[in-house]
Amino acid sequence: MKKIIALVLVVGMFSCQKKEEKKCSSGKEKKLEMYQMSEMAALMEQMYVDNQHVKENIKNGDTIGKFPEHFLKIYTAKFTDETDNDLFFKVKAKEYIEAQQLLYSDSKNVKEHFNAGVDACIKCHENKCGGPIQRIKKLYIK
């Protein structure tokens, strides 16, 4: 009987203890923000997809269609970091658009013109935002 009473007392003591929950707080509420692409980042993603389709059409001997006018937004799209929209970028953007326009106007040398457009992308990305270079290189037609 003494053992039962002792057991009840021990269980009772442990069950009545309050457990405090520790909350980690830095004093500031953190607000989760979803990443939103800048206009330029979204445009470049679209250009990449468009160029993947053009590459496949060239490899299959199909026509490539007309110059995509939305490529011209490269001159006006807002950047993630507006300081990237400098003279160097403007020169490289012009070279890229010229290469693309030549691709769509000269159907005899599409492979060479397409690869020249890829070159223009890489030359710019070597100096600005180098992350996608390996991905861009996959566009080359061998």
Language-model region placement:
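Sec-dependent signal peptide recognition
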Residues: 2-7
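Short, linear, compositionally biased motifs with a strong N-terminal bias
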Residues: 10-11
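C-terminal motif of bacterial Sec signal peptides marking the signal peptidase cleavage site
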Residues: 14-15
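Extracytoplasmic c-type cytochrome modules immediately beyond a signal peptide or single-pass transmembrane anchor
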Residues: 19-117, 133-142
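The canonical Cys-X-X-Cys-His
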Residues: 117-129
